[in-house]
Amino acid sequence: MLQPKRTKFRKVHTGRNRGLAQSGNKVSFGTFGLKATDRGRMTARQIEAGRRAMTRHVKRQGKIWIRVFPDKPITKKPLEVRMGKGKGNVEYWVAQIQPGRVLYEMDGVPEELAREAFRLAARKLPFKTTFVTRTVM
């Protein structure tokens, strides 16, 4: 599963997920993409589940790019532990997703196959997504 090799700080503030995606909002590498239309958090497990669903559907043909990386640690205190005594241990890693962010890209497959693969990947995610194609300018 994806997680940073090393970080400057072990734990981070909760923060707020606001605004629209300023970067990573265009299809850059492939021909087709899966774009978030809602905001939320995408865990490393969800990223991997989506990748597996797409890879299995296209039968390992074409190329898939993962455009998000889980770089935010989420902490959790153990069960039946009283409040206080510091922040809990890092439980898992998430990527914060804003509307407009391209999550996955695909190339080398027909559009119908890509659409179906992205639909299967979108079922694994906790927010709404849409299918996008590369715009040539």
Swiss-Prot record:
One of its GO terms (cellular component) is cytosolic large ribosomal subunit. Coiled coil: none annotated. Gene3D superfamilies: Ribosomal protein L10e/L16. Keywords: Ribonucleoprotein, Ribosomal protein, RNA-binding, rRNA-binding, tRNA-binding. Residues 1-16 have a biased composition (Basic residues). GO terms for biological process: translation. One of its GO terms (molecular function) is tRNA binding. InterPro entries: Ribosomal_uL16 (IPR047873), Ribosomal_uL16_bact-type (IPR000114), Ribosomal_uL16_CS (IPR020798), Ribosomal_uL16_dom (IPR016180), Ribosomal_uL16_sf (IPR036920). Residues 1-22 are annotated as: Disordered. Part of the 50S ribosomal subunit. HAMAP family: Ribosomal_uL16 (MF_01342). NCBIfam families: rplP_bact. Binds 23S rRNA and is also seen to make contacts with the A and possibly P site tRNAs. Belongs to the universal ribosomal protein uL16 family. This is Large ribosomal subunit protein uL16. The lineage of its organism: Bacteria, Pseudomonadati, Pseudomonadota, Gammaproteobacteria, Alteromonadales. The gene is rplP.
